[in-house]
């Protein structure tokens, strides 16, 4: 009989831990959860106090059999799943399935996979914490009840094959509300005035920039102001210089890591968590699901040593950060490198980048603040109540900025000057030029993954372990899309006063460009509206946040999980019964856009079997005409003109080499048809606007590819039927009506007839 069996969640983690324990320990993986709620039915026994009905999935039976066999041959079993609620539940399921006594089985937890941490955990085991298990069990049961009862309703009332979840539905609501703010927004122009001044007494005429505190609604107002400045006097009303400090951000929590990795590295939330998981399992960083910003004394000491070594003692300053997040869970420390002295690692490019981000953020959190000088100069204008304001900021000592600067979700604005000249109150300044530029109010920005996580955290919705799955789920369900927008061109006016003359320029700019922004789909908006109308309490942000607090109370042992579920399920089930019997019509999902000027028939938009579409009704006895919406279009904001444009396909652009160029959209996307051949449009080509020259170019490219595919790379005089060709997946042998793949790494121009025949013979066996 062996001495010890340690069971962890992942094979990578098992491999790392096995290095630290001696020959008396065998380390095996459960590959995550080994049990889940039954999928055959509800999986919850409503008549037995919401008792869960668990089953072992078929793909986990072999794992369970192996672990069960090993456990029977082992004196001591150690359950070493992750230290959060999900990990505690995995430990409990293992104990139940393997027949281990709950109150005696050794449970060990560690925040980092290092030898000292593992050995310390072995020295101080505990038993399974049933409060944590019950908190996870409550979440799982509650989410199953909600999904099981809501999904059939959506099938019946909205569209088949839809589903809903408690947290996911609230996340979609956030996106829908933001989208409707954008749809309702009407951009208005205004004029922003900026001047370049210099001190009247300055022989060098050193310029500094100042902005007018007032904005103008119209060009006329802006031009009138500029004319008033021709003979005006400009005097310094206030010149103020103040020292300031900028403090480092605390070490990463799960949500701040997801946000910063999104902003700095362009990683999605799920990618960030996947990469962080790999780093953790290799023993390179601490546990990545945490809402704590605390660092251990040992980590703070290691940071100090590293800072002094790299930058000198004047850059070091220990900080003890306190976690402010309500309902912070069990994890004891922020995300940090396991070994602070290890500045770089080996690994994939993504692993290297994320580790570098974590290392810099951790070390910077223990550095001194940056010291700044902030200067403000206020300039009066004779004959006007408006003032120009110049701001400047100079870094006197970089402090933590030497290593790391936190990014934000804010749109980049106009920055103040760096160094401003020394000025005194009452001093005269002269304008080199004053410019009034037409600007436009902007709608609220769509959420990206990072800003959505931030908002969910602010509202108290979800926990470190749920942010990534929530976003992945709403995208996979088709309720939300992540997309880029190229932006549009617009012109704007710029008026510049130099001396006594005002010059006008008309310039162009791109606006509305977006990258990786989350937008609700039509079906996402319809489902959201239905759930809000029938299940208002469930969709309420405060209600959802309070449910999270109830889970926390279960974890703290303050309430029982069954009673918490009962308090929720009773009112919820009544709402389901009411919604089931309430007559709702699908007509509210149809939007009348207007009348087709050609036929005089009604044009409407709705969700059809294959997604959002527009319809022009036919005469009695005639079929209606249908067209799908373009990517990024929404039923709610679609105009009649945009809808009619969707019926412009197929478009005949005219003849080319004796055959018409016809643009259309087929099963595999937009195309140009030329006779019997088809060429796909590029992603940047719009089928509704593509011109003749571009379509002809695509046809020529397709013809060239077809010609190249038909031209052999090599032939053999001894065997004319055998040809070496280049296909879609690389070079291949064509022989007597059959094709044979050439092994990877073989140069087709150098292959011999003998080698070809050998490949053919081998393939036939």
PLM-predicted stretches and their roles:
Residues 53-57, 264, 459:
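Flexible beta-alpha connector loops of hexameric P-loop NTPases
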Residues 1-140, 149, 319, 406-409, ...:
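Intrinsically disordered, low-complexity regulatory segments
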Residues 217-251, 258, 424-430, 435-437:
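Metal- or metallocofactor-binding catalytic centers and their adjacent structured scaffolds
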Residues 2-5, 16, 127, 151, ...:
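Basic, low-complexity terminal or inter-domain segments flanking catalytic cores
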Residues 81-83, 259-261, 289:
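Short glycine-centered, acidic/aromatic-flanked micro-motifs in structured strand/loop junctions
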Residues 113-195, 241-245:
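C-terminal or mid-to-C-terminal helical accessory/interaction module adjacent to the motor/catalytic core
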């Amino acid at each position: 009989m062996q001495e010890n069996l340690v069971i962890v969640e992942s094979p990578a983690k098992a491999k790392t831990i096995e290095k630290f324990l001696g020959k008396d320990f065998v380390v095996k993986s459960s590959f995550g959860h080994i049990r889940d709620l039954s999928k055959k039915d509800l999986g919850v026994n409503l008549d037995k106090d919401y008792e869960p009905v668990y089953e072992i999935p078929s793909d986990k039976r072999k794992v369970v059999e192996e672990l069960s066999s090993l456990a029977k041959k082992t004196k001591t079993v150690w359950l070493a799943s992750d230290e959060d609620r999900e990990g505690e539940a995995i430990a409990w399921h293992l104990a139940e399935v393997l027949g281990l006594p709950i109150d005696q089985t050794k449970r060990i937890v560690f925040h980092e996979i290092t030898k000292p941490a593992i050995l310390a955990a072995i020295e101080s085991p505990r038993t399974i914490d049933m409060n944590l298990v019950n908190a996870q069990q409550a979440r799982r049961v509650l989410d199953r009840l909600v999904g099981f009862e809501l999904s059939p309703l959506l099938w019946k009332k909205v569209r088949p094959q839809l589903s809903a979840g408690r947290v996911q539905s609230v996340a979609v609501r956030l996106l829908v509300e933001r989208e409707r703010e954008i749809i309702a927004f009407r951009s208005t122009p205004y004029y922003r005035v900026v001047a370049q001044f210099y001190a009247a007494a300055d022989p060098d005429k050193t310029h500094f920039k100042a902005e007018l505190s007032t904005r103008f609604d119209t060009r006329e107002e802006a031009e009138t102001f500029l004319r008033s400045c021709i003979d005006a006097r400009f005097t310094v009303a206030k010149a103020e210089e103040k020292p300031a400090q900028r403090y480092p951000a605390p070490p990463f929590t799960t949500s701040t890591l997801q946000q910063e990795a999104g902003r700095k590295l362009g990683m999605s939330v799920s990618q960030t968590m996947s990469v962080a998981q790999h780093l953790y399992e290799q023993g390179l960083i601490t546990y990545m699901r945490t809402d704590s910003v605390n660092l251990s004394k040992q980590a703070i000491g290691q940071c100090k040593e590293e800072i002094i070594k790299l930058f000198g003692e004047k850059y070091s300053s220990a900080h003890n950060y306190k976690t402010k997040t309500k309902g912070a869970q069990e994890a004891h420390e922020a995300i940090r490198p396991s070994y602070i002295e290890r500045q770089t690692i080996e690994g994939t490019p993504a692993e290297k980048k994320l580790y570098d981000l974590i290392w810099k953020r951790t070390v910077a959190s223990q550095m001194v603040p940056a010291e700044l000088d902030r200067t403000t100069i206020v300039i009066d204008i004779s004959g006007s109540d408006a003032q120009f304001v110049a701001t400047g900021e100079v870094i006197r000592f970089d402090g933590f900025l030497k290593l790391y600067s936190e990014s934000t979700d804010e749109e980049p604005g106009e920055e103040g000057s760096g160094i401003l000249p020394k000025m005194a109150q009452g001093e005269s300044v002269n304008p080199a030029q004053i410019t009034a530029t037409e600007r436009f109010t902007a709608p609220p920005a769509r959420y990206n993954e990072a800003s959505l996580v931030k908002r969910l955290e602010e509202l108290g919705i979800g926990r470190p372990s749920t942010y990534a799955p929530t976003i992945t789920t709403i995208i996979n369900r088709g309720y939300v899309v992540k997309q880029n927008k190229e932006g549009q061109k617009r012109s704007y006016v710029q008026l510049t006063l130099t001396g006594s003359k005002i010059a006008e320029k008309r310039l162009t700019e791109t606006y509305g460009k977006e990258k990786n922004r989350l937008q609700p789909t039509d079906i996402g908006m319809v489902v959201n509206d239905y759930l809000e109308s029938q299940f208002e309490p469930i969709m309420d942000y405060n209600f959802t946040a309070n449910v999270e607090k109830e889970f926390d109370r279960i974890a703290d042992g303050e309430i029982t999980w069954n009673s918490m579920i009962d308090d929720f399920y009773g009112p919820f089930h009544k709402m389901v019964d009411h919604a089931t019997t309430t007559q709702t019509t699908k007509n509210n999902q149809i939007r009348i856009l207007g009348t087709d000027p050609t036929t005089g028939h009604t044009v409407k938009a709705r969700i059809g079997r294959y997604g959002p579409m527009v319809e022009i009704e036919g005469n009695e006895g005639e079929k209606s005409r249908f067209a799908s919406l373009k990517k990024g279009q929404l039923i709610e904001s679609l105009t009649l003109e945009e809808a009619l444009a969707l019926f412009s396909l197929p478009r005949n652009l005219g003849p080319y080499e004796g055959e018409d160029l016809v643009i259309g959209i087929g099963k595999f996307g937009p195309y140009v048809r030329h006779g019997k051949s088809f060429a796909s449009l590029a992603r940047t080509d719009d089928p509704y606007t593509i011109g003749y020259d571009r379509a002809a170019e695509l046809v020529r490219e397709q013809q060239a590819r077809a010609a190249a595919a038909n031209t052999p790379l090599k032939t053999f005089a001894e065997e004319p039927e055998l040809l070496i060709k280049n296909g879609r997946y690389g070079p291949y042998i064509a022989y007597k009506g059959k094709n044979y793949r050439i092994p990877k790494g073989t140069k087709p121009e150098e292959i011999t007839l003998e080698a070809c025949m050998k490949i053919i013979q081998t393939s036939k066996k």
